Swiss-Prot record:
It is found in: Membrane. This is UPF0154 protein OB1676. Keywords: Membrane, Transmembrane, Transmembrane helix. It is a single-pass membrane protein. Belongs to the UPF0154 family.
Amino acid sequence: MSTIWVVLIAIAALVAGVALGFFIARKYMMSYLKKNPPINEQMLRTLMMQMGQKPSQKKINQMMRAMNNQSGKE
């Protein structure tokens, strides 16, 4: 009878650990994305205007493609 209890407690601890780990990881990722949002076209356009460049759609698309290619290699 005690072996069954050990197995049940081990399974319960495993399930609780997985659930707790999921929620901790989810909270961490949400706070990380809130602090460091991914760059979109509007942010890139604003950045180029602040640097004194005229942001054409061709330049925006080129830079977005370059950033996506760079992030895909990592």
